[in-house]
Swiss-Prot record:
Predominant place of localization: other
Annotated source species: Rhizobium etli (strain CIAT 652)
One Pfam family this sequence matches: FliE
Family: Belongs to the FliE family.
A molecular function GO annotation: structural molecule activity
Name of the protein this chain belongs to: Flagellar hook-basal body complex protein FliE
Length: 113
């Protein structure tokens, strides 16, 4: 997907968007199909959630270290703010997923057996 975005951003004003090669668009459309990515790779839901949790922790640790670097004067204000905004977005995503998991659990407990 990133390569597709880079290809679109590299287009000049005189070229049409149709000039983007079809290989990248085909690969990006296949990657967005909901049922095929996990089934083809054999990736479990637990491993995806575990990877996401470790990425969230790494993002928060990176923001913390960047804030310390900002206090020391070795990082610019922009770098600190970008790191903090990324950590905030990661935290908001984790909170939203937690809320969905809790609501799904509550729905399951309400089911009659």
């Amino acid at each position: 997907m990133i390569s597709s975005v880079q290809n679109v951003s590299n287009l000049s004003m005189t070229r049409a968007l149709g000039a983007v090669d079809t290989e990248n668009s085909a690969s990006s459309s296949a990657a967005t199909m909901p049922g095929t990515a996990g089934a083809a790779n054999g990736v479990s839901f637990a491993s995806v959630m575990g990877n996401m949790a470790s990425d969230a922790v790494n993002s928060l640790k990176g923001a913390e270290s960047m804030s310390f670097a900002g206090i020391k004067g070795t990082a610019t204000t922009r770098e600190v703010v970008d790191s903090m905004l990324q950590a905030e977005q990661t935290l908001q995503t984790a909170i939203a997923i937690r809320d969905k998991v809790v609501s799904a659990f509550l729905e399951v407990t309400k089911m009659q057996m």
